[in-house]
C-alpha cells in the first residue's frame, strides 16, 4: 500500500481554522494549534451566549414592564395576573415595547388588568 501524503487536505484544514481565527490576538491568529483551541472555545462561548441572550432580554422586558406597571399602580406580578385573567394575549416583548413607546396604550392595558383583578 502506498504512503499517502495529506499535504493538500492538511493545508486546507489549517487554512479553514486560521480563517476563523482571523482578528484574534497574537498566536491565537497565527499558530494552528493555538488557533484551533481558540476557535473551539469561541464556539462554546457563542453557543452559551445565544441561550443567555434570550434570558437577558426576558429579564430586561420584565424590568421595563414592572417600571411602567408601578407608574400605573400595579406591581409586575399583579399586572401579568390581571392580563391573563382579562384574556389579553400579549407577550412580554410586545408589552415592554408598548410600555416604552405608547404609554397611553399601556395605561389602558393596565386598567383592563386592574378590572380583571377586581372581578
Curated annotation (Swiss-Prot):
Alphabetically list the UniProt keywords: Ribonucleoprotein, Ribosomal protein, RNA-binding, rRNA-binding
Q: Give the function comment from the record.
A: Binds directly to 23S ribosomal RNA and is necessary for the in vitro assembly process of the 50S ribosomal subunit. It is not involved in the protein synthesizing functions of that subunit.
Descriptive protein name: Large ribosomal subunit protein bL20
GO cellular component terms, semicolon-separated: ribonucleoprotein complex; ribosome
At the highest ranks, the source species' classification is: Bacteria, Pseudomonadati, Pseudomonadota, Gammaproteobacteria, Candidatus Pseudothioglobaceae
Q: Give a GO biological-process term.
A: translation
Instruction: Tell me the disulfide pairings in this chain.
Output: none
A single Gene Ontology MF term assigned here is: rRNA binding
Spell out the family assignment given in the record's similarity comment: Belongs to the bacterial ribosomal protein bL20 family.
Amino acid at each position: 500500500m502506498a504512503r499517502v501524503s495529506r499535504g493538500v487536505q492538511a493545508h486546507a484544514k489549517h487554512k479553514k481554522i486560521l480563517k476563523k481565527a482571523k482578528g484574534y490576538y497574537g498566536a491565537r491568529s497565527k499558530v494552528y494549534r493555538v488557533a484551533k483551541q481558540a476557535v473551539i472555545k469561541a464556539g462554546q462561548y457563542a453557543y452559551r451566549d445565544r441561550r443567555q441572550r434570550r434570558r437577558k432580554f426576558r429579564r430586561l422586558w420584565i424590568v421595563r414592564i414592572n417600571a411602567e406597571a408601578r407608574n400605573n399602580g400595579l406591581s409586575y406580578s399583579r399586572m401579568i395576573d390581571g392580563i391573563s385573567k382579562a384574556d389579553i394575549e400579549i407577550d412580554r416583548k410586545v408589552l415592554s415595547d408598548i410600555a416604552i413607546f405608547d404609554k397611553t396604550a399601556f395605561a389602558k392595558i393596565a386598567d383592563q388588568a386592574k378590572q380583571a383583578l377586581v372581578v
